[in-house]
């Protein structure tokens, strides 16, 4: 699948098949996150891949809107070392991971992290140093169903020269 098709067909998936994802595929997806743009190329990220069902359940239970993480094959926690642009850098890495998952025929869903009260709890659970901040939790797996939700048409969001 080419990059444009991947971006135009990506969607948030919250229901997954009970099917594992190959380690090589996961590593390729994370490698795409690693290659994201970052301010002054600082690359402040660390990626924690969680396949263990019991740990995924703990993560799902801590979140307020991520219960489906428990049924996904994988949860990727994206953390960035605290700095001026940690949120932008980590968000770029997260989007690369979402697109890479789609390119591999997988579904994914970005669960917010940075502004959530559970962010420090998640960092402790996964053993991160105190100077790392949770950017996102990403559920990844084989989607239980296909289809795309409606999106706003381009004419509603594109403006030339001014609003």
PLM feature segments, named:
Residues 1-163:
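Acidic, surface-exposed loops and disordered segments
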């Amino acid at each position: 699948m080419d990059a444009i098709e991947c971006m135009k067909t990506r969607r948030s998936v919250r229901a997954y098949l009970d099917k594992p994802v190959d380690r090589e595929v996961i590593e390729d997806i994370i490698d795409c996150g690693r290659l994201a743009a970052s301010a002054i190329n600082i690359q402040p990220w660390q990626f924690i891949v969680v396949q263990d069902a019991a740990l995924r359940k703990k993560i799902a239970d801590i979140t307020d809107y991520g219960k489906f993480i428990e049924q996904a094959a994988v949860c990727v926690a994206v953390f960035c070392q605290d700095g001026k642009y940690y949120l932008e850098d980590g968000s770029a890495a997260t989007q690369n991971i979402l697109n890479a998952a789609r390119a591999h025929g997988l579904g994914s869903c970005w669960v917010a992290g940075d502004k959530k009260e559970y962010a420090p709890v998640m960092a402790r659970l996964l053993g991160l140093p105190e100077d790392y901040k949770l950017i996102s939790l990403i559920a990844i797996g084989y989607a239980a169903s296909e289809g795309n939700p409606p999106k706003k048409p381009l004419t509603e969001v594109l403006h030339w020269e001014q609003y």
